[in-house]
Amino acid sequence: MWKLKIANGNKEEPYLFSTNNFLGRQTWEFDPDAGTVEELAAVEEARRKFYDDRFRVKASSDLIWRMQFLKEKKFEQVIPPAKVEDANNITSEIATNALRKGVNFLSALQASDGHWPAENAGPLFFLPPLVFCLYVTGHLHEIFTQDHRREVLRYIYCHQNEDGGWGLHIEGNSTMFCTTLNYICMRILGEGPNGGPGNACKRARDWILDHGGATYIPSWGKTWLSILGVFDWSGSNPMPPEFWILPSFLPIHPAKMWCYCRLVYMPMSYLYGKRFVGPISPLILQLREEIYLQPYAKINWNRARHLCAKEDAYCPHPQIQDVIWNCLYIFTEPFLACWPFNKLLREKALGVAMKHIHYEDENSRYITIGCVEKALCMLACWVEDPNGIHFKKHLLRISDYLWIAEDGMKMQSFGSQLWDSGFALQALVASNLVNEIPDVLRRGYDFLKNSQVRENPSGDFTNMYRHISKGSWTFSDRDHGWQASDCTAESFKCCLLLSMIPPDIVGPKMDPEQLYEAVTILLSLQSKNGGVTAWEPARGQEWLELLNPTEVFADIVVEHEYNECTSSAIQALILFKQLYPNHRTEEINTSIKKAVQYIESIQMLDGSWYGSWGVCFTYSTWFGLGGLAAAGKTYNNCLAMRKGVHFLLTTQKDNGGWGESYLSCPKKRYIPSEGERSNLVQTSWAMMGLLHAGQAERDPSPLHRAAKLLINSQLENGDFPQQEITGAFMKNCLLHYAAYRNIFPVWALAEYRRRVPLPYEKPSTERRS
């Protein structure tokens, strides 16, 4: 039976190290002797139910670890269920009971170190490259036991679409990128050409061939297939490592790139520069014959460089980009491959690229910035030295990425421990039930205090293209090391809120100097236009997006400002200013003023804001209204507030909820979910947005209707049902935040109960009529 381990690290292992004793680390271990007959049966039943219902609900309910935690804590919900018939007759007692049930359940999900574990996955291109890397390096069976491989295959089967392919993410239509990767992954893990339940492999291969064959895979797929030896490097556009030795004044210097783009193409360029190809096994030779329409030896690789399936081509290359690739391919690459330039330039460039890879690995404790980079950097280290310590350190951090649920084993983005915990604690504080959960709040506060990054990247970090990180919070845990503005702002705000609760309940306050450092981080990430970026200051120019090589994502070349990050920063800085009015007062006031102007300036014509990190306009409108309200804007004195309220009120469904399709993200316009289907997480965001804008004082009936939906949807144990996933990134991809379904309904009910006047007595029969 699989068990989730918390803050687990072997102190005797010389290649595994941590900055704070592995706080927040979550890893899975298989114990063949664990579990009673009843527990094992419950797990199998959860797996069966998911598989049977997989085309209706695509995301897991994250049940395996929840079963474990609830049993370990002997959780039992004692509050009886209640249903609301008339939304206008919700009493304080009904709202409080529903809230208390949700608070009790959410509290029971807290880990011993104070964080809230949860799945953070969903893209279907995360896991196969890790399998490919382990296969190429010969470590697949060492790292992935038979039990691992069984669960990986389960995940692949569970998320195969009815047409035989796999989408970019678990809710998406089939793409060449993920269908090819997952087909090869199944074959590497032992399935035959026609293996898998329901003819999974044959149906996948048919999809690939019916859509033109694997020459139509996008560029990231071309890279991984070239590494495996089932594609030729000459079929990829150039990724010259000489990029890393360009003069810093050039606009295309890597220091000006978005950190994720920079750190993906860093190891890619190393592997491309080496033209590395793994061992050509009999399986690789078979795959060459299985995924193409023409014989492998007759493929026109030069033509293949520009091929991309229409199902994948979200961001097609502009003509100028293809001209650049052709020039590099025809003239530059042959030049750099010849003596003496291969010695003077290429070897030097490869050395510089590897220097950066090692630097990033060390400063993230070999977690790296994310899962895409993890497999690439690990492989690059092995190519440099198969027996080196860098590769050994990488192997020990693979488990940080793996997650088990009823739909199998998947690879996480890199964990959302701090992000989820900051929101969970804010929801619990908003409940006004703090006296009932002091231990939960104390553990959570300790987790946040001990997870703040306490140092900048090592050495001369500016020459390694890095920004300050001291005083920040990351998305996952402190060892990850990468500052993020919204993660910093939400954890910062949470620490400030907890500091306002008596220390005998939540523990001692943070050192003010640590709070000042968080202010420094937030101010450093604000651009001239008032917007706040996500990871680093915006250094590159917008026109560089014309060079986006990915085909499947948008706005990934340079750093951008975001409404959500800007709003989070406003709310945190305003609360800080209230508690510490004498620290950098003028700078903070100026920052807030500019940030408010930015939020107002990017509002859509319909009153919404585009969401970059959630689905989509509903998510970002909650942030937009929250930021403006924190800055003193009201429905009466601010047009943007009125427009935002109008957007939310006009998109509310007849059942009282809100439901927005994920297609809003790639299409960049509001698209409602089909019919009357509402999403409880999105309903919670909309409720809180309206509450920020004073809807309770004007007309609380939309809030009552939304609260009725939340209360009536709550399960008997205090949980809420899993619905469509609501996280997003890079315009075209979704991310499953499994904790959202508990955090946001609880938070919305807390704010509803706190801000909306509710009767204390149950309405009499006469009043109902």
From Swiss-Prot:
CDD domains: SQCY_1. It catalyses: (S)-2,3-epoxysqualene = camelliol C. Belongs to the terpene cyclase/mutase family. The keyword Isomerase applies. GO terms for cellular component: lipid droplet. PFTB repeats lie at residues 149-190, 641-682. Keywords: Isomerase, Repeat. It comes from Arabidopsis thaliana (Mouse-ear cress). GO terms for molecular function: beta-amyrin synthase activity; camelliol C synthase activity. GO terms for biological process: triterpenoid biosynthetic process. Its EC number is 5.4.99.38. The active site is at D486 (proton donor). It is an enzyme of class 5 (isomerase). InterPro entries: SQ_cyclase_C, SQ_cyclase_N, Squalene_cyclase, Terpenoid_cyclase/PrenylTrfase. This is Camelliol C synthase. Converts oxidosqualene to camelliol C. Minor production of achilleol and beta-amyrin.
